[in-house]
């Protein structure tokens, strides 16, 4: 005889995990295994953090002859094939990266089992895999509250040509459909320590740019990175997904 009814359903619509494959390379086979295990446990969103660098750049500070560019010696990774290159050297890591074909297929395969893959390209900070190749686009200075930490992992978004350059990185994957129109694209936006006005203007521009074709996600930072004058456009934030990782950086 029936003794009751079990109703089993998730409490939250987005059940996510962020996997940093940038600072330490992770094979595609392992990524697939993680996605399958997540799906088994009713998780449905795997955010793949594709680029970053070792965070403690103050470890690369020379007491006798301090120079922000010393921090370029720190390890960085960019794990997705890219046509963006300088003098024949791509921003994609030579030691290990995924081809566009295999990553695009990974997105499609996971979608069939109810798992959304969210590729994250972290800009304008955490970007030394990019600035290490395009050093002329880096912020050459020190973190305001830490005079020993270099800012060379920051792209200098005070310059229009750098903002345009960043767009080309995303556009490549959108135009060749590595990221199709259903792919949520994460633009990073994490922990920018340089010019707050330039950061907020950049967020208005990059969010609106990506939203022309794709849903967009970003790390919360707009509460902390302020200049008391540059408003974030309603059309930039409407519908954008935010990783609320710290109330100090974004309070919702």
Residues of each region from the PLM?
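Residues within well-ordered alpha-helices
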Residues: 34, 106, 206, 251-252
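A general structural signal for short secondary-structure junctions and capping/turn motifs
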Residues: 8, 109, 232-235, 252
